[in-house]
């Protein structure tokens, strides 16, 4: 009889009966009872009251019964930790059982019971099992160490289990080696800078020896570990590749992808002119092709990985394009991936085959697939110049089919072809215009409008065509509205006498009737350009456009290198780095391909080289955490040469001038928009006219954010340093408005505390504020909250919440903030300095090991020393004062009478600063050593230390 009978009972009083059966003297009865308990537990019934009775059943030699009891324990131990202690003695006893299966089962179960109270009892049995004579027990114990580390990392280190794991790498049994490697790899994920695996040529040799005899999953663990190793020279890299290459013919696709990952990384170290390099490239193709004969799901994963490989090394699969031709029964997700790879492999040699395939795909029934096929024809035209004419001809044939979505997609790609090959295929415009009425998608309408505007001089009725789009202007998408505005301005510049009324109509619609700030601003820019200098307008709007690139959807090179290091994992399927989708992944070690260094001796540690590579390859599209680091590595000047203006504290950058009325809803300079002639009077007198047509969008914060910001308490952290208020904008420079202020950090939020004083003879209203781009992306979270008029001689205090989600630009000095304030009188500009302590975040405390590894990892030339003079505080007071400002003391030592404080802090943009503060009792001068990856920040951190400790 099957076990399904255990799931069918619905009797009342079942728990009482089970309790009696669990205490029955007959083994078979007890076993049946435990099965019923497990069945009840499986369907969601609460059988926790039977805990003591089930635990009593542990005392048995029957392996099946033991497994069932252990399953029950794992499920209920967390909710009944005190009861779980009852089972400890049985576990310890089972760990010494003569049967190795029972020993392994006991140690595995103890590792799965995530209860702190039990972990301390687990140490002794685990230590014995790690040295057990049976390899099955040792391999199980190795995994248990990783589980224990997840519960209590400190205990694992204190008990020396990490050393025991390292010893297992030299074990005679390959599965023990594989599990030890897997456990160490997982532990090192949470300690990215600690060289736990200690990869050196001797250990690598042991791993390669074990590789041949492992199970398939053991091989994956070992291959993933090998991919983190950086060989000393190309000879060692070649030797490893030779021993890994046989894995390419493995039946398990995961093993194949792990082997491909190792070889792709080590290819970077091999000289490109060598015979072995070319032979290895040839060997990589067949296994990748074989992966495409599996299940659709396996094919999809393989194709996503192949997409990365083709972007990195297209020569591997350049002869295999036919493999990626779509089969009629492929699922849509496989079809789309194959199509993408086909385009990447398209070349002059195979373009005829590719185009024939694509034309066939464009007649299929699946709309998404057809769209992508039509788009692919356009990409072929752009990528392979010799095929452009044939591609255009194919697209025209498809347009003649009059299938709506095919026509629309074809028009979108023809626009790109016009951009790539100007003045070459414009003869087809007439055919395109015939299909104008059938266009209903924003992309297609925008593409057609762009074509009409760009080639208006060749189209007799261009004004009529654009006017037809203008009739439903407010119903169009933003993309179409912006394109139509630009197209009509182009038309006006080419045929001014015939289209004056049309351009005034579109400018009026864009600036007066639209709620979209982007559209309004572009309208004002064109309006001012046309009214002040039509010649310049022509040069700007009708300027020669840069040619579009061949591949617009390539993954950015640094990210591609990182994804190559994650072949075979979820990152390679998402095409995103792990830290983009793994929760709490800030500690995940970012991987990069090794740099070819010939035969020089670079350290064996994968950590050192990886970090160096990370520094040398700043991200092109940085995450918020890396923005400043990348800016500091680049020699960025200001974007424009700003002339100094004597009446201001800084070079006048037009933060608000170009579109303040439209952005903030007020009228400066008397009714802008009524006539282009008044455009010039809109520019503040202190701002050079050069900057007028460059408005910065106003910060629009959501109502929800506003509620959160306003709900934060006023109370500050005890002892948190606040710089005294300074006058930022004197009344003499702001027509009677005086602004003084400072910055504070309280309850995890940054505030700009300001005092507005009206020293003029008239009241002030309509206040608004905006920041220029700055080094830390600081912007207001909410609009300026001054809701009542500021009367003469009246003052008002304002607390403005800030965040660091704005655009970033390196300033000089680094903490400089340029501010524009507008009221009913004028727009005023001032600059102030942000004390960096308000940018210190609460999670700036590093673990000791991470601190030590990071300190060693940062180059010595990044270390800067400063003297803090005339400070009479002891080490504890210093530590306490700094902690109130989110500077955390990691460790304190006394060396030869000197107190040494080791501290860490973190800025809002993710930059870590490590500090060593030396305090000599009786000596009022302290020595501060600072280390960080962006040493330009250190000077400002020192200033903050000085201010905090002296106030």
From Swiss-Prot:
GO terms for molecular function: clathrin binding. The modification 3'-nitrotyrosine is found at residue 574. The modification N6-acetyllysine is found at residue 318. It is found in: Cytoplasmic vesicle, Clathrin-coated vesicle membrane; Golgi apparatus. Keywords: Acetylation, Cytoplasmic vesicle, Golgi apparatus, Membrane, Nitration, Protein transport, Transport. It is a peripheral membrane protein. GO terms for biological process: aorta development; clathrin-dependent endocytosis; coronary vasculature development; intracellular protein transport; kidney development; postsynaptic neurotransmitter receptor internalization; synaptic vesicle endocytosis; ventricular septum development. InterPro entries: AP_beta, AP_complex_bsu_1_2_4, ARM-like, ARM-type_fold, Armadillo, B-adaptin_app_sub_C, Clathrin/coatomer_adapt-like_N, Clathrin_a/b/g-adaptin_app_Ig. Belongs to the adaptor complexes large subunit family. Adaptor protein complex 1 (AP-1) is a heterotetramer composed of two large adaptins (gamma-type subunit AP1G1 and beta-type subunit AP1B1), a medium adaptin (mu-type subunit AP1M1 or AP1M2) and a small adaptin (sigma-type subunit AP1S1 or AP1S2 or AP1S3). This is AP-1 complex subunit beta-1. It comes from Bos taurus.
């Amino acid at each position: 009889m099957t076990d399904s009978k255990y799931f069918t009972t619905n009797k009342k009083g079942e728990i009482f009966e089970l309790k009696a059966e669990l205490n029955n003297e007959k083994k078979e009865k007890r076993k049946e009872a435990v099965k019923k308990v497990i069945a009840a537990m499986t369907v969601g019934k609460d059988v926790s009251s039977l805990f003591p009775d089930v635990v009593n059943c542990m005392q048995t030699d029957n392996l099946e019964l033991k497994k069932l009891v252990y399953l029950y324990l794992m499920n209920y131990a967390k909710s009944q930790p005190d009861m779980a202690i009852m089972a400890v003695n049985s576990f310890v006893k089972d760990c010494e059982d003569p049967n190795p299966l029972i020993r392994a089962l006991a140690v595995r179960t103890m590792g799965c019971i995530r209860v702190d109270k039990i972990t301390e009892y687990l140490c002794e049995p685990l230590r014995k099992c790690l040295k057990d004579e049976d390899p099955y027990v040792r391999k199980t114990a190795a995994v248990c160490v990783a589980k224990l580390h997840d519960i209590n990392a400190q205990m694992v280190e204190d008990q020396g289990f990490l050393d025991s794991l390292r010893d297992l790498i030299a074990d005679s049994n390959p599965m023990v080696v594989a599990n030890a490697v897997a456990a160490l790899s997982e532990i090192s994920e949470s300690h990215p800078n600690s060289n736990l695996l200690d990869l050196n040529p001797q250990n690598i040799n042991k791993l390669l020896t074990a590789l041949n005899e492992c199970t398939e999953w053991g091989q994956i663990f070992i291959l993933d570990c090998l991919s983190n190793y950086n060989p000393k020279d190309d000879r060692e890299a070649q030797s490893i590749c030779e021993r890994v290459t046989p894995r390419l013919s493995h039946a398990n696709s995961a093993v194949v992808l792990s082997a491909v990952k190792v070889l792709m990384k080590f290819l970077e170290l091999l000289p490109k002119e060598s015979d072995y390099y070319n032979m290895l490239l040839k060997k990589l193709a067949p296994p990748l092709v074989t992966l495409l004969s599996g299940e659709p799901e396996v094919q999809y994963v393989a194709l996503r990985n192949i997409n990365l490989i083709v972007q990195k090394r297209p020569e591997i699969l350049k002869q295999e394009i036919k493999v990626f031709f779509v089969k009629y029964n492929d699922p849509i997700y496989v079809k789309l991936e194959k199509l993408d790879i086909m385009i990447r492999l398209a070349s002059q040699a195979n373009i005829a085959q590719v185009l024939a395939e694509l034309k066939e795909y464009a007649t299929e029934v699946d709309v998404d697939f057809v769209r992508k096929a039509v788009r692919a024809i356009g990409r072929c035209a752009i990528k392979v110049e010799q095929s452009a004419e044939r591609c255009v001809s194919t697209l025209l044939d498809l347009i003649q089919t009059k299938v709506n979505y095919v026509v629309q997609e074809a028009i979108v790609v023809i626009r790109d072809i016009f951009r790539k090959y100007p003045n070459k295929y414009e003869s087809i415009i007439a055919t395109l215009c015939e299909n104008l009425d059938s266009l209903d998608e924003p992309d297609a309408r925008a593409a057609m409008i762009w074509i009409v505007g760009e080639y208006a001089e060749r189209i007799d009725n261009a004004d009529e065509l654009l006017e037809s789009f203008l009739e439903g202007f407010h119903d169009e998408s933003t993309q179409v509205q912006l394109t139509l505005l630009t197209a009509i301005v182009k038309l006006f510049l080419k045929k001014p006498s015939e289209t004056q009324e049309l351009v005034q109509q579109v400018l009026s619609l864009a600036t007066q009737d639209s709620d979209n700030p982007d559209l309004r601003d572009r309208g004002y820019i064109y309006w001012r350009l046309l009214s002040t200098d039509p010649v310049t307008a022509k040069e700007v709007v009708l300027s020669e456009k840069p040619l579009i690139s061949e591949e617009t959807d390539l993954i950015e090179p640094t990210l591609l290198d990182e994804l190559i290091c994650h072949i075979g994992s979820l990152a390679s399927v998402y095409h995103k780095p792990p830290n983009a989708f793994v929760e709490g992944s800030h500690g995940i070690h970012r991987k990069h391909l090794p740099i070819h260094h010939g035969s020089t001796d670079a350290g064996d540690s994968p950590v050192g080289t990886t970090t160096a590579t990370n520094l040398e390859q700043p991200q092109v599209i940085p995450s918020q955490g890396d923005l400043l680091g990348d800016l500091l590595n680049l020699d960025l000047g200001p974007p424009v040469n700003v002339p100094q203006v004597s009446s201001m504290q800084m070079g006048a950058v037009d933060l608000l001038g170009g579109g303040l009325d439209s952005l903030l809803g007020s009228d400066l300079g008397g009714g802008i928009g009524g006539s282009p002639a008044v455009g010039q009077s809109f520019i503040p007198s202190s701002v050079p006219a050069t900057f007028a047509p460059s408005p910065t969008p106003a910060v629009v914060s959501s109502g929800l954010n506003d509620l959160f910001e306003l709900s934060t308490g006023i109370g500050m952290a005890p002892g948190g340093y606040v710089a005294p208020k300074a006058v930022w904008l004197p009344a003499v420079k702001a027509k009677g408005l005086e602004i003084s202020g400072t910055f504070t950090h309280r309850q995890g939020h940054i505030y700009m505390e300001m005092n507005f004083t009206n020293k003029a003879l008239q009241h002030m209203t309509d206040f608004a504020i905006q920041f220029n781009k700055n080094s830390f992306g600081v912007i207001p979270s909410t609009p300026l909250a001054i809701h009542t008029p500021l009367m003469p001689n009246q003052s008002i205090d304002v607390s403005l919440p800030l965040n660091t989600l704005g655009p970033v630009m390196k300033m000089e000095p680094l903490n400089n903030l340029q501010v524009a304030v507008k009221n009913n009188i004028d727009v005023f500009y001032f600059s102030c300095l942000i004390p960096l302590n308000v940018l210190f975040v609460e999670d700036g405390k590093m673990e000791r090991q991470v601190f030590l590894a990071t300190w060693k990892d940062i180059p010595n030339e990044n270390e800067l020393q400063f003297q803090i003079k005339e400070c009479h505080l002891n080490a504890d007071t210093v530590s306490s004062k700094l902690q109130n400002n989110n500077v955390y003391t990691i460790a304190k030592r006394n060396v030869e009478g000197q107190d040494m404080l080791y501290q860490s802090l973190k800025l809002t943009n993710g930059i870590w600063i490590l500090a060593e503060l030396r305090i000599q009792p009786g000596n009022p001068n302290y020595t501060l050593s600072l280390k960080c990856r962006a040493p330009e920040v250190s000077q400002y951190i020192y200033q903050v230390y000085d201010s905090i400790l002296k106030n």
